[in-house]
């Protein structure tokens, strides 16, 4: 399976904090190694880092990256770029090819995505051809990419973990 990171572009600090935080949390929970945030919003970065420190894993977040440079650096290091959009090739048609890559940077937009992204991406991936959220696109993409294996991942360094129960809620704290 590839090493995966997410590049969040178009984040508007005055408007998108909750959604961008959820992009990072979904990325972490569903198998990505980290997130690059193409905006300066240390509050979002802190929220995601706080969750990762309590719930385990080595998820990273880099705040205020330049999106074009991030893509160029990723590709220069041999990685591939998958841009999630309504307008790309159907995810079900390309996911097997993407799964064979060693490193994948998943680009998730907020507001209108710069047109250059389509040309810079190795894969423009349509997670349905209908409008829906970037969070659902990312979640579906990662689940298909990792074939559901991320759903039962456990983090040995977690300070908090959920113990599955038929009824009620049970957490274990270390």
Curated annotation (Swiss-Prot):
MF GO annotations: tRNA (cytidine(56)-2'-O)-methyltransferase activity
The keyword Transit peptide is annotated on this UniProt entry: no
UniProt-annotated binding residues for S-adenosyl-L-methionine: 84, 109-113
Originating organism: Methanoculleus marisnigri (strain ATCC 35101 / DSM 1498 / JR1)
Family: Belongs to the aTrm56 family.
The protein, known as: tRNA (cytidine(56)-2'-O)-methyltransferase
Catalysed reaction equations from the record: cytidine(56) in tRNA + S-adenosyl-L-methionine = 2'-O-methylcytidine(56) in tRNA + S-adenosyl-L-homocysteine + H(+)
NCBIfam families: PRK03958.1
Domain of life assignment: Archaea
